[in-house]
From Swiss-Prot:
A single Gene Ontology CC term: cytosolic large ribosomal subunit
Name of the gene encoding the protein in the UniProt record: rplN
Family label: Belongs to the universal ribosomal protein uL14 family.
Disulphide connectivity of cysteines: none
GO molecular function per UniProt: large ribosomal subunit rRNA binding; structural constituent of ribosome
Keyword Transport appears in the UniProt entry: no
The protein's name: Large ribosomal subunit protein uL14
Subunit description: Part of the 50S ribosomal subunit. Forms a cluster with proteins L3 and L19. In the 70S ribosome, L14 and L19 interact and together make contacts with the 16S rRNA in bridges B5 and B8.
């Protein structure tokens, strides 16, 4: 579960390294799970890339440390909280995605992120 003030790692090559969640998008929502969109501030970035430190960006959560329960009864949990930066059209800002992503992203129409990911769990 991601909430305000939560730090996340960035799972793409957009130039940002760490994000801090500012707001979970949706009608008065407190927590974000895999596939949810958040507004975040860039806390650490690579120099001379598309994003700079203190930029406010939108990102979709791709991995959470909290257990993710599936309808089949399975549950998965990742080692870190990670997000991928997106633009207004919900397309990723980077050209590569690092690490595994959850299958729930495909159900939420983030097919571009799923196709860039090396592994879908």
């Amino acid at each position: 579960m991601i909430q305000q003030e939560t730090y996340l790692t960035v799972a793409d090559n957009s130039g940002a390294k760490r994000l801090q969640c500012i707001r979970v998008l949706g009608s008065n929502r407190r927590y974000a799970h895999v596939g949810d969109v958040i507004v975040a501030a860039v806390k650490d970035a690579v120099p001379n890339m598309g994003v700079k430190k203190s930029d406010v960006v939108k990102a979709v959560v791709v991995r959470t440390k909290a257990t993710l329960r599936r309808e089949t009864g399975n549950s998965i949990r990742f080692d870190d909280n990670a997000a991928v930066l997106i633009n207004e059209d919900k397309n990723p800002r980077g050209t590569r995605v690092f690490g595994p992503v959850a299958r729930e992203l495909r159900e939420r129409n983030y097919t571009k992120i799923v196709s860039l990911a090396p592994e879908v769990i």
